[in-house]
Amino acid sequence: SDLMIRFECDYGEGAAQPVLDLLQKTNLEQTPGYGMDDYCDQARGLIRKLCDAPDAGVHFFVGATQANFTVVDALLKPWQGVLCADSGHINVHETGAVEATGHKCLALPSVQGKITAQQVRDAYDAHWADASHEHIAQPGMVYISNPTEDGTLYTKEELTDLSATCYDCGLCLFVDGARMAYGLASEANDLNLQDYANLCDVFYLGGTKCGALFGEAVIINNPDLDQDFRYAIKQHGAMLAKGRLLGLQFLALLNGEDGT
C-alpha cells in the first residue's frame, strides 16, 4: 500500500468495520432522537451489565473534551475546582474548556502522570487550614486519566486509595477513560469495569480513540449526581439529535461482529 503510516495519534483512521457495517445496516431506520431510541437503550443496558451496575446512569457524548467539561460543570458548585495532575488533559490539552465553565483546575505535581491519595488529602487539608479558604476555589472533585497522559496505569490499590480518600473528604472521583480500552487490555492492568463502577462516582468508556468514528459513554454511579444530568448535557451543547449513532457504535464495539 502507498498509504502513509502515521504515529502522531491513535485516531487517524475511521472506525472498526463492525461499526460501519451496523451504521450502514440501520441507516434508513427512523428512530426517536436525542439518545432515547432502542439502540441507545440496548447499549446502556449492555454497559450496565458489563459494569455490574444495573442502576448506573449511562450517557453518550460525541467527544472527550465535551464529556469532561460537562461532567465537571454539572457536578461541581460554582465556587468549586477540580484537583488533577499537572499533566492532566483538562489542565494542559483542552484549551481551558473546564475553566471556561468557571471551575479552576487545581493542579498537583504528578509522577509519570499519576497523583496519589496522599496528595489529594494534603491539598484538601491545606485548603481548609487556610484562614482565607473562602477566597480560594474549594476542591470539589478529583480528576484522573487512566491510562494517564504518560501512558502509565493506575493500579487497583491506587484507585482504591483515591476512592477512599475522596469519600472521606466528600469529593467526587471522576476518571477520564478516553483510552480506557487500552488500559483494560494491558498485561500490566489489574482493574476491570466493575472496579471502576464500584470505586468511582463517574467514569467514561472511550470510543473515539478505541474503534468508533466518535463517541464516549459516561457512566454515573451515584444516583444523586445523575439526577437532571441530561439537562446539563443539553445546556452544554452535547445532546446529539441523531443520538442513535452513538448507541449503535457502542453496540457494535461491545457486541462483536454484527452488533447483535
Model-predicted regions and their roles:
Residues 6-9, 58-62, 84-85, 144, ...:
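General beta-strand structural signal in soluble alpha/beta enzymes
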Residues 138-139, 153, 192-260:
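Active-site C-terminal subdomain of aminotransferase-like
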Residues 55-76, 106-113:
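Conserved core of the PLP fold type I
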Residues 154-186:
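Catalytic PLP-binding core of fold-type I/II PLP enzymes
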Residues 16-64, 86-91, 97:
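Conserved N-terminal alpha-helix of the aminotransferase class I/II PLP-enzyme fold
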Residues 74-92, 121:
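Conserved PLP-anchoring active-site segment centered on the Schiff-base-forming lysine
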Residues 102-140, 144-147, 154-161:
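PLP-dependent aminotransferase-class I/II
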